[in-house]
Amino acid sequence: MNPRPRKLKVLRWVPNRWVLTRGARRERVLHLTFDDGPHPEHTPALLDLLAAHGAKATFFLIGREAERYPDVVERIVREGHVLGNHSWSHPQFDRLDLAAQREEIQRTDRLLTRFDGAARHDFRPPRGVLPRPMVLDCVRRGQRIAYWSYDSLDYSKRPAEILIASAQRYPPEPGEILLMHDDSALSLQLLQTMLPAWAAGGFVFEPLRPSA
């Protein structure tokens, strides 16, 4: 259960201003990121845990779910976390043409702007799929793609004990961007153990810094 995605072998050659794969290695910071929310039960529970540890994160939201649960999105922003774009409907991006991909992204940005006032948000493609035309289109429009360097594997539906054991065996390094999901309880169960452990190791938890 190696937490580092294979795509990093290729993505490390792509400028970070186009596809962000990790933060600064010199800082003892971890970047917690959560995909597929907001969820009416799991996201608030996760926000409670983050608040208890003074941790800030980035939430890559599905547009239609953000529209469905605006109160949860408002709380995310109010508590100092950062919103990211995870498409409108979480489709299989490599099955869409470029115009449809762009609409998935821009429709979500328009909605998120109503919550945080930001004109543009970091985009994380569903399932990490990176069609080349989409990447080039994002570069042309100045929209950064945010990938990850450390995969919690919480979507694998393995028991939390196995995910915790993997996180302990393969500890994250400074600047890592951690991939998690807030559409189930697994990330919460993982972080209930690992947040205190990482904090005890001197880590602080910050959202991804917005692109220029």
Give the location of each predicted region.
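A cross-domain feature marking catalytic cores of carbohydrate-active enzymes
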Residues: 34-36, 61-63, 85-87, 125-127, ...
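Divalent metal-coordination and catalytic microenvironments
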Residues: 35, 50, 59, 83, ...
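A short acidic, amphipathic alpha-helical/loop segment
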Residues: 45-46, 71-75, 133-137, 190-194
